[in-house]
Amino acid sequence: FAAFAFVALLTNGARGGNERTILAGVAASQLFNAITAYTISTSASAQQARDVMFWLLGSFSGVRWPEFQLVIVVVLAGLAVCLWYARTLDAFTFGDDAAASLGIAVPRVRLILFTTAALITATIVSMAGSIGFVGLVVPHVMRFFFGPLHRTLLIASALAGAILMVLADIASRLLIAPQSLPVGVVTALVGVPFFAVIIYRSRNK
């Protein structure tokens, strides 16, 4: 939530544009990664440092059923909130001015959705660590197959993201068996080339 507050501050609350929000997110990520690295370097033992490194790259190896139950509740509640605002998200694709002209309270709705996303993300990251590129790869693929309407896109992305995580976890346990890789390494191997393709295609449009 400190990272969320930092991003909200840099983006002028809920009034920041998409580009400003992305840049603020990158800045927050670098800042808190630096704080984490400093904490590990100064106060962690070798085993603790290894455990934290696995957590930073994402791993399901230490997840227990009680934590998983909490994640299910938070994710389903957050998904319900997002589905409630699905039509509003459709309007946002045309820009804030267009959404406001339809009577949507843009700052208030943006704040609600940012807070919901922060709650979901914080809960999952606290359990499994930071697993990159899933939020980039899956929605783009689902948008290609199911179109831009968020009521369908949100559900499809949630299901496809869960399937991708299961496959990535299996791959992380088999690639260098009997040892295991962090799940984030597997998703990065898939996500980085895909992200490069997205950037290349956007430049050619």
Predicted regions and their residues:
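Alpha-helical transmembrane segments in inner-membrane proteins
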Residues: 1-205
